[in-house]
Amino acid sequence: MIEAAVSMSALGLGLGLLLGVAARRFHVESPPILDAIEGILPGTNCGACGYPGCRGLAEAMSEGAAPVTACAPGGRDVALALAAIVETDGGGGAVPGMAEAEPTVAFIFEDHCTGCMRCFKRCPTDAIIGANRQIHTVVTDACIGCNACIEACPTEAIVARVKPKTLKSWYWDKPRTAFEARDTEVAA
């Protein structure tokens, strides 16, 4: 019994040591720009950009094959941060090809839903709830607006709608000083 425990411990220790040496010996250094781009991307690996996950999109952006506006869930803020890293001319806060848009979420018309589970399988954040051959619905707080479910729906029961304003998603405008308010009134 003790021999078995000692042999298993020695085997585990030896293989662990071998894996540690192999990891250091065969380590491949990735370019720093690739790690920086991947750090800015949301990391949901939804595939809405057409690349296999956020790492694939980061590789394409670092090579110049993908635009900074390719990440739909990231939106304008991610595109601006990526434009600064990839050195795209942002034009004073404007990203080429990206319009100012409000965040959207998926909405399922329940009378058209057949319960085929295709949207359920495509959602990267598990925002769609429902069972097989039952009506599905979307949890708006979990939806990132990648629109992967819209493409997967065979009955076109899913549409993108503007994210409803709730206490969690609604923000006040930035307060203005008295001088800024006065300048706005004079200009009008």
UniProtKB/Swiss-Prot annotation:
Sorted UniProt keywords: 4Fe-4S, Electron transport, Iron, Iron-sulfur, Membrane, Metal-binding, Nitrogen fixation, Repeat, Translocase, Transport
Membrane topology: Peripheral membrane protein
Cofactor(s) required for function per UniProt: [4Fe-4S] cluster
Keyword ATP-binding: no
Predominant cellular place of this UniProt entry's protein: membrane
Positions of the 4Fe-4S domain: 29-88
Function statement: Part of a membrane-bound complex that couples electron transfer with translocation of ions across the membrane.
Record family assignment: Belongs to the 4Fe4S bacterial-type ferredoxin family. RnfB subfamily.
Name listed for the protein in its UniProt record: Ion-translocating oxidoreductase complex subunit B
